[in-house]
Amino acid sequence: MSVLVVGTVGIDRVETPHGERSDLLGGSASFAGLAASFHAPVSLNSVVGEDFPAHHRAIWEKRKIDLSGLQIAKGKTFRWHGQYEQNMNNRRTISTDLNVLADFQPLLSESQKKLPFVLLGNLTPDLQHSVLDQMQKPKFVVADTMNLWIDIARTRLLELLPRIDLLILNDSEATQLSDESNLVRAARWLRERGPRYVAVKKGEHGCFLAGPEGAFAAPAVPLEQVLDPTGAGDTFAGGLTGYLAGQKETNLSTLAQGVIEGTILASFTVEDFSLNRLASLTEKDIAARRRELLRLINPNP
């Protein structure tokens, strides 16, 4: 089944201890859409400006992602400039220029309204609601969020929870939204407010998944070098959702495997800047990384 991915597309400038790169393809929809395409057909909905480079668009086209929902608006594409500290866990935003993203309204085509799987990438809760208002009974809805929306749009975010099936957020965001310091209690608090499943990302410490059938935890893939963490969370969400779209059932078992697939793809994203590593991946690469991760989960299969 196909996945609708709605989110941001931007042009990034990234500084890390390993170097600086400019004019990179970025945005939640960019990473999530490409990751989901490894498991399912993807239809993208976002906005770019008249300055958006053709070579960035070609990255999606190579993966046969449907770009009919990519609006080209008059003006400049969303731009972000970020800097990572030495430990790569702390990031500082140097500048953000919303440009055409400031007026973005995700207008879905008739075909997009009927898609069974929806990934609401990192957008304002109002825009996430707008997407769901246009959908025709999707089978499974995944939503990602961030601390900014918890700070400035908490009520609208809480109103979104009953409308989705899976909420993805990191550990500090789960604590912030639930006011629970324990992640098990935080996930329970969140699930009581709507979503059947909650996936809590813990960075280099993996992911915790909670649902009505129980819980699952997966480690991160140990990496000797991380060049650029940008987009890792979006990649995780896209890989997970894409995997689910290829399954007959959506339950704890398939979501657990989805967590593994999302973790695998995210581990590649951080090995290079932007989508460079993800765009060059082969099925052989993914299979080898999957075996590596599964050995961590079950050392004696």
Give names to the regions the model predicted.
Residues 11-23, 38-119, 132-138, 287-301:
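Conserved N-terminal subdomain of the carbohydrate kinase-like
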Residues 34, 80-83, 206-210:
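Short beta-strand scaffold segments in enzyme catalytic cores
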Residues 32-42, 243-245:
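Alpha-helix C-terminal capping segments
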Residues 183-301:
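Conserved phosphate-binding/catalytic region of the ribokinase-like
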Residues 1-4:
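Extreme N-terminal starter segment of soluble prokaryotic enzymes
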Residues 136-140, 147-217:
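Conserved phosphate/ATP/ADP-binding segment of small-molecule kinases
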Residues 36, 170, 233:
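Short, conserved phosphate/pyrophosphate- and ester-handling motifs at nucleotide-, phospho-/glycolipid
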Residues 56, 127-134, 155-159:
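A short acidic, amphipathic alpha-helical/loop segment
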